[in-house]
Amino acid sequence: MIQHSIFKHIFKILLSLLATMSIAAHAQYKTLDPNDQNDPDAPRFWEEAEIKIPTAPPSKDLKPFYVSAITQLKFALDAPSITFGKDEVIRYVLVITTPSGGQQVSYEGIRCEKYEWRLYATMQKDGEWHKSVNSRWQLIRGAGHNSYHAAMVKDAFCDNSIPRRSAKEIIPLLKP
């Protein structure tokens, strides 16, 4: 009889944990009716968190990563800029360098769950950041010699469709 009550107690604890995990998994999703937020069966939609465009140029802590054997461009992430939103979006500053030394600096986000990326802003020659006019989520394309988004997602940012949780976890996975 004692064993039965212990198993019953453990079962209740496991059910509570599963319910909590389910609610946490839906945290970045909102319900149409705020009163339904704790209802696991309520229809939900994803909502992107408010973003802040960087105010400074990239740091000197650039982490290069491999994209393709046939690209002439060099790609690097500004390590201190990598952030993890409650909306499950990984945001970062990317620096692309041409063979002649020219650079393109952008602030972007990757959404592992949907295999999408978004350009938020670019840094101009004067060092000022300018918001992207047509910023929208786009599917990541894996083909092409400059498909750096696919390289970041496959090698470092995502574990299948689940985003990694820290820059310390991502940086070692970048293939230089």
Task: Describe every region a protein language model picked out.
Residues I2-L14:
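Bacterial N-terminal signal peptides that target proteins for export
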Residues T20-A24:
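N-terminal signal peptide c-region/cleavage motif recognized by signal peptidases
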Residues S16-L18:
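Classic N-terminal secretory signal peptides
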